[in-house]
Amino acid sequence: MKKQNNLRSLAAQAVEQVVEQGQSLSNVLPPLQQKVADKDKALLQELCFGVLRTLSQLEWLINKLMSRPMTGKQRTVHYLIMVGFYQLLYTRVPPHAALAETVEGAVSIKRPQLKGLINGVLRQFQRQQETLLNEFATSDARFLHPGWLVKRLQNAYPTQWQRIIDANNQRPPMWLRVNRTHHTRDGWLGLLEDAGMKGYPHPDYPDAVRLETPAPVHALPGFAEGWVTVQDASAQGCAVFLAPQNGEHILDLCAAPGGKTTHILEVAPEADVLAVDIDEQRLSRVYDNLKRLGMKATVKQGDGRYPAQWCGEQQFDRILLDAPCSATGVIRRHPDIKWLRRDRDIAELAQLQAEILDAVWPRLKPGGTLVYATCSVLPEENRDQIKTFLQRTPDAALSETGTPDQPGQQNLPGGEEGDGFFYAKLIKK
C-alpha cells in the first residue's frame, strides 16, 4: 500500500474533519475508503467509529501523557495518537503492528519529524496503562459524552440516564425490515437460515428482524431484489403508527434517505405518496431506495416550513413528519453526533420543529392522522414539543400515544434493542 494511504493517518484525518471542522462522518468517510484496498475498508471504518465513540477517553489520555497539545499544522498528529491509543485499547491489532503503523502514519501526513514523539507517547501509555485507566474510571470523561449532554440526560431521566449513556456507547445491532409484498417475515427468516445466518423477530414491529451477527447487505437473501431493507426497529415504528391505507394521499416530510417512504408503500402499495426533503443531495438516496424496491412515489425538494412551494393547496389523509432533530437517540449508530451537536442547537431545533408542525397541520384533512417522530431522547424536542402544540392547536387530538400531560411514546436506546425514538400520533378533529 502506498504510504499516503496509510490507514491510521486516514482515520486521523477523518476524525479531525469531524471534530475540528464539524463535518459528518457519513460524508467524510466514503471518499477516504476509496483510497484503501477493499480488505482494509472495514478496519478504516472501525478506527473512525471507535475513536469517535471513545473520544473523551482518548483526549483525556493525551492530556495526561503530553505536556502541551498539538496545534496548527501538527493537529492531525493529535488524532493520529488517538488512533494509536484506540488500537491498543479496543482492537485485536497486535500491539507491535499498531505502534509501527501509527508511527508510520506521520510520514503520510508529512510530519516524519514527529515519528519519535508518537512512538514515545504510545510506549509511555503501554507502560502506564493500568494506572491511567484506573484514574480515568473516576473522571468525568468516563461517560464518553460531552458534559452538556450528560447534564441534559441527567435532568430528563434521573433514574435512567446512565442506562442511556451505556447504550449509546455500545455497538448497534443490525436491524432489517422484511418487505411484506414479497415475503412474510417468517418466510424470509427461513431463507436467512438457509443462507447460514440467524435472525430474531421484534415483538412489536411486524416487519422487523434483528440479525444475530451483522452482515454485508449483499449476503442477505434478496437484498438486491428488494426483499429486505436495512432499517432500525424503532424507525419502523413510524409506519406502524401511521397505519397507511391503499388509495390515500400521504405526505412523508423530511423523507430522505427514503426508508420510511418505502415502508409506507410496503404497507399500502396503492397509496399516493409524496416524499419531500430539504436536502437535494440526500433525495438521490430516496430515488435509489424506490428503484431497488420497485416502487413509485412523487419526490420533491422542499422546506417543510413552506408547503405551498411544493404542494400548492393539496391536503393529505396522513402525514409523517420525521422532524429534523438532535439525533441523540442514534448516537450508538452515529457517534460523531456527540461532537457535532452543541447545547445551543437544541432550542434552535425545537423552534424549527414547531414551525414545521404549524405549517403542515393545515395540510391534513379533517379526520386525518399526523405522526410526529424524532430520533431524539430530549424532552424539548419530543413531549414538550407536542404538549405545547396541542395547547395552541384546538383541532388536534392525541391518539394511542401517551396522555395530554405526557404525550407521545419515547423509546430509549437499547429498549428491545432498538434506537432512541419518539412518536406522537395526532388526529385532526
UniProtKB/Swiss-Prot annotation:
Keywords: Cytoplasm, Methyltransferase, RNA-binding, rRNA processing, S-adenosyl-L-methionine, Transferase
Catalytic activity: cytidine(967) in 16S rRNA + S-adenosyl-L-methionine = 5-methylcytidine(967) in 16S rRNA + S-adenosyl-L-homocysteine + H(+)
Superkingdom, taxonomy of origin: Bacteria
Record-annotated active site: 375 (nucleophile)
Keyword Cell division: no
Annotated segments matching region Disordered: 397-419
Gene3D superfamilies linked: Helix hairpin bin, NusB-like, Sun protein, domain 3, Vaccinia Virus protein VP39
Transferase is among the record's keywords: yes
Subcellular location: Cytoplasm
Main location, first listed in the record: cytoplasm
Residues the entry annotates as binding S-adenosyl-L-methionine: 254-260, 277, 303, 322
Matching PROSITE patterns: NOL1_NOP2_SUN, SAM_MT_RSMB_NOP
Function noted in UniProt: Specifically methylates the cytosine at position 967 (m5C967) of 16S rRNA.
Record-given protein name: Ribosomal RNA small subunit methyltransferase B
Underlying gene: rsmB
